[in-house]
């Protein structure tokens, strides 16, 4: 009888252990596929709701050939525009003369007419800088000789009679300055040096903090942003000024920041990916994109708001062309940087990583497990030796749970020592502990 009771207790303990293992495996599998299950359950939710919660299951990495084609077409158009159309360089790069005087009630059309009658040619630009009593008229033209400058000043004084600081009409109120074309070249040279130093520091940091494949992807994405932004300027015909060059450098920081946000999530999702066969590396990277999608959009929107405010102040209130050029290149760069961090940098990272032996072997194992229909951990148990087996489905889990709920109490009744995994059994005595000190003493 004792041997039979012992055998019964062993059977009950074994079933309880199997229940615990199956339950943990089912929970692990449920957690591993939470994004897919959530996306299927939230199918009736709106697009914005799924986008905000990160459960949209938008396929980005799986369609990376499409995004590579779109990105390649954009770069091709940008390069073709740069080569065949070229840039519209401002006076700081081509050299020229700037003439300015207090506005008063002067209109731009009147200034252009006086300039044409005085010199027989059109000015490059006539803008009104500032507002109110401090507003000035700024004329930019090709390089003028001393005689041409004096003739233009006389014509402007006769036509508009600008007033000096004492409130009386004076020729001294009209100022002129010449800009050498070498100054813009010096600014560009220094900007290129700063760009190279920036790229080197970025490459070192990402390589040390993450990995070399992320470095290659991030640097390529930044070059993509620079090329497309420059192509937009060439295609639309925006004037290139030193402020434009400075703006190109500022958008690199935003582009890198947005890219690193996604890369950090990719690293978190793919940490130890080779020890599991639930998802491939590409699927984990796509999950990271979905989880950071809304964050990238919110970051871009917050970055665009001050840029738009700067453009409004520069164009409608102050009329400062330098601020307009700076804000314009930043606006274009932020939009392109957001696109590249989601649809270009991460798909490129996945493409580079899939060329490695580790990722290729892991992808084959995942696909083999899915095709065979075996549990997620059966193959890992023999190859990696550390992963728990997953339950086949929820119905089997429910059946095991019901069986255990009946067997666990019997095991507890047959022995004072509870079996592993069995439910706790309350004491049978009539008097329960009160929790008070010295309660049982008389």
UniProtKB/Swiss-Prot annotation:
Record has Transcription regulation as a keyword: no
GO biological process: intracellular protein transmembrane transport; protein targeting; protein transport; protein transport by the Sec complex
Transmembrane region(s): 67-87, 187-207, 218-238, 243-263, 301-321, 331-351
Entry GO CC: peptidoglycan-based cell wall; plasma membrane
Membrane topology: Multi-pass membrane protein
Comp. bias intervals (Low complexity): 402-432
Gene3D superfamilies on file: Multidrug efflux transporter AcrB transmembrane domain
Classification via Pfam families: Sec_GG, SecD_SecF_C
Bias type Basic residues, positions: 433-442
InterPro entries: SecD/SecF_arch_bac, SecD/SecF_bac, SecD/SecF_CS, SecD_SecF_C, SecD_SecF_C_bact, SecF_bac
SUPFAM superfamilies given in the database record: Multidrug efflux transporter AcrB transmembrane domain
Top-level taxon: Bacteria
Subcellular location, principal: membrane
Region spans: Disordered: 1-39, 366-442
Signal peptide limits: none
Family in the record: Belongs to the SecD/SecF family. SecF subfamily.
Biological role stated in the UniProt entry: Part of the Sec protein translocase complex. Interacts with the SecYEG preprotein conducting channel. SecDF uses the proton motive force (PMF) to complete protein translocation after the ATP-dependent function of SecA.
Oligomer and partners: Forms a complex with SecD. Part of the essential Sec protein translocation apparatus which comprises SecA, SecYEG and auxiliary proteins SecDF. Other proteins may also be involved.
Protein's UniProt name: Protein translocase subunit SecF
Protein source organism: Mycobacterium tuberculosis (strain ATCC 25618 / H37Rv)
